[in-house]
Amino acid sequence: MNVLLCSINTFKRLYDISAVEVGQHFYWQMGDFQVHAQVLITSWVVIAILLGSTILVVRNPQTIPNFGQNFFEYVLEFIRDVSKTQIGEEYGPWVPFIGTLFLFIFVSNWSGALLPWKIIQLPHGELAAPTNDINTTVALALLTSVAYFYAGISKKGLAYFGKYIQPTPILLPINILEDFTKPLSLSFRLFGNILADELVVVVLVSLVPLVVPIPVMFLGLFTSGIQALIFATLAAAYIGESMEGHH
């Protein structure tokens, strides 16, 4: 019971912290609601890049694949391998979800280093990679949580919740807390790594000539890709775990 109360209090404190603003932000007013426009603008750009490149490649498939078709087929095979390794033989229906997570996070991370967001002037604040905002990473983590709950319940029904008292009912609070910490760890890991990478590059560019930070920028591109892979792999692992019922 103490563990449950502690977790509830933790989430209340996190909710209070979410109301604190650091820096300036650009909002759209929609009725009584304020929408965080910076994240929406950059997210739409990333989605447009993904949709546009996909349409260009698949609208006229060739018998002898060209470079773009070969690249997309390689990416699809890679995502299928990751899904099959983590989920098992029932991986098929989850390939689109895992692939969407991986590609959105990958392109979002790279957009922070390759697209000149800062030159676009806003009335307040500035644009940055979508994954540089905690709202985006939390939303992706919550989607993952919904996915693995759905996977477990759709396969086992209400018997899925029996995992919380395995191997002994004494572990019930800890097993419940584990499901709350999964989205927290997913979201903060991705947000922290992307934010830290962009801050390091900004500080180096302001202190030394542009040539010096270039190796750090290339390292940032590599780590950004790794973070996308880690997020997608963990999401697939959580889905596979909920379907198999083991930890």
From Swiss-Prot:
Keyword Mitochondrion recorded: no
Domain of life: Eukaryota
Membrane topology field: Multi-pass membrane protein
Gene3D superfamilies according to UniProt: ATP synthase, F0 complex, subunit A
Pfam family, one: ATP-synt_A
A GO MF label: proton-transporting ATP synthase activity, rotational mechanism
Keywords recorded for this protein, A-Z: ATP synthesis, CF(0), Chloroplast, Hydrogen ion transport, Ion transport, Membrane, Plastid, Thylakoid, Transmembrane, Transmembrane helix, Transport
UniProt keyword Ribonucleoprotein present: no
Cysteine-cysteine disulfides: none
Record-annotated membrane-spanning stretches: 38-58, 95-115, 134-154, 199-219, 220-240
Subcellular location, record wording: Plastid, Chloroplast thylakoid membrane
InterPro entries: ATP_syn_F0_a_bact/chloroplast, ATP_synth_F0_asu, ATP_synth_F0_asu_AS, F0_ATP_A_sf
Any one GO CC term of the record: chloroplast thylakoid membrane
NCBIfam families, alphabetized: ATP_synt_6_or_A
Function, as annotated: Key component of the proton channel; it plays a direct role in the translocation of protons across the membrane.
Subunit (UniProt): F-type ATPases have 2 components, CF(1) - the catalytic core - and CF(0) - the membrane proton channel. CF(1) has five subunits: alpha(3), beta(3), gamma(1), delta(1), epsilon(1). CF(0) has four main subunits: a, b, b' and c.
Family: Belongs to the ATPase A chain family.
Entry protein name: ATP synthase subunit a, chloroplastic
Taxonomic source organism: Lotus japonicus
Lineage: Eukaryota, Viridiplantae, Streptophyta, Embryophyta, Tracheophyta
